[in-house]
UniProtKB/Swiss-Prot annotation:
Belongs to the TrpB family. Tetramer of two alpha and two beta chains. The gene is trpB. It comes from Mycobacterium intracellulare. This is Tryptophan synthase beta chain. Pathway: Amino-acid biosynthesis; L-tryptophan biosynthesis; L-tryptophan from chorismate: step 5/5.
């Protein structure tokens, strides 16, 4: 298959991110050290093993890889640019480069993973795809891929999130998806995942669960990471071409962790590169109203794997909170937990107030409206830049665009008046 005029020979293809195992693979049971594994009902074990077998087959199937490369280049718009942000850099006091995943088709990094999983579902003969979504970006990407491939699509979304991300709900429905508003629990992302798992148990014969983040039971953490690694592979080549060296730090926001693991992974073996993830601190970690899993959580089993989560002394999940729907999740992917202990990755946190402030900062310095999730990473960059110094190079993963968050931001900043004069 002809790959496309858009493909740049100096940058890696998406297939390069999945065809060969990395030096940091889970064991046969899906464990990264003590983290990961499969903590699921017996009824799901067979279908999860079916997904594992199919993925291991297709990741070395040249026809699958060529099709993925073709769609990523011609349909999704890869490679995404790496943009040096001059006015943001001036304010930060360091050289800031933005990896523009917001420019992908559907407006975020989510399409990288979804195209891979939807192709896998099609090759497995599944006619129906289900997915969970928080901010709606994964839901939109899944609905998009299903429309492209002619698959039935059902999206589970917490009722709180359907209200604060109404624009993305409309997009999903326009694309032909059925959106199920989940009324249980906190009515956010974790509850949407629970409902999706229940659906999968009931309809496993004809249904594929397109998991949106690098969490859940094996093989999802590794598979989602593989489809997202193209972010970091491109960024690594781009920064060396533009700046002549590797960055001093690579930053990303962290909820479940797919955008972060995607950009971090190709830099893991570079000792001079700091990998820093910024969690959503909500109203402040000390208040208990936050989604900072590492800062305020502890290890435990949650939604299919063993990792860090927000839980009480009895092991019951604590409700998370963030103005960002995509970061409003009380767990994190197991590979992040492992990397936190084994590699030079660190975690910081950003409150709602600072995340929203840096949302506006990026709008007014660079003319880029980011997702509120991504604004947490921008806030992190302005936080660490003084420590690193003016000569430092910082790569920030701008994981998504902020169309979906304009109403939230307008309410936060009081921008809804009829006139400025």
């Amino acid at each position: 298959m002809d790959i496309s005029p858009r493909t740049r020979p100096d940058l890696p293809l998406p297939s390069a991110a999945i065809a060969e195992p990395t030096r940091h693979e889970p064991d046969a049971g899906g464990h990264f050290g003590v983290y990961g594994g499969r903590y699921v009902a017996e009824a799901l074990m067979a279908v999860i093993e079916e997904v594992t077998t199919a993925y291991e087959k297709e990741r070395v199937n040249q026809d699958f890889l060529d099709t993925l490369d073709y769609l990523q280049a011609n349909y999704a718009g890869r490679p995404s640019p790496l943009y040096e942000a001059p006015r943001l850099s001036e304010q930060a006091g360091a050289r800031i480069f933005l990896k523009r995943e917001d420019l992908n088709h559907t407006g975020s990094h989510k399409i990288n993973n979804v195209l891979g999983q939807a192709l896998l579902a099609q090759r497995m003969g599944k006619k129906r795809v289900i997915a969970e979504t928080g901010a709606g970006q994964h839901g939109v990407a899944t609905a998009t891929a299903c429309a492209l491939l002619g698959l039935e699509c059902v999206i589970y979304m917490g009722a709180v999130d359907t209200e604060r991300q109404a624009l993305n709900v409309a997009r999903m429905r326009l694309l032909g998806a059925t959106v199920v508003s989940v009324q249980s629990g906190s009515k956010t992302l974790k509850d949407a995942i629970n409902e999706a798992f229940r659906d999968w148990v009931t309809n496993a014969d004809n249904t594929f669960y397109c998991f949106g983040t690098a969490a859940g039971p094996h093989p999802f953490p590794a598979m989602v990471r593989d489809f997202q690694r193209i972010i970091g592979l491109e960024a690594r080549a781009q920064i060396q071409a533009q700046a002549g060296r590797l960055p001093d730090a690579v930053l990303a926001c962290i909820g479940g962790g797919s955008n972060a693991i995607g950009i971090f992974h190709p830099f893991i073996d570079d000792p001079g590169v700091r990998l820093i993830g910024f969690e959503a601190a909500g109203d402040g970690v000390e208040t208990g109203r936050h989604a900072a899993t590492f800062s305020g959580g502890s290890p435990g089993a949650f939604q299919g794997s063993f990792s860090y989560l927000l839980q009480d002394e009895d092991g019951q999940t604590i409700e998370s909170h963030s103005i960002s729907a995509g970061l409003d999740y009380p767990g994190v992917g197991p590979e992040h937990a492992w990397l936190r202990e084994r590699v030079s990755t660190t975690r910081g946190w950003v409150r709602n107030t600072r995340g929203c402030a840096r949302f506006r900062t990026l709008c007014r310095t660079e003319g880029i409206i980011p997702a509120i999730e991504s604004a947490h990473a921008v806030a992190g960059a302005l936080k660490v830049a003084p420590e690193l110094g003016k000569a430092a190079i910082i790569v920030v993963n701008l994981s998504g665009r902020g169309d979906k968050d304009v109403e939230t931001a307008a309410q936060w900043f009081g921008l809804l008046g009829s006139s400025d004069r």
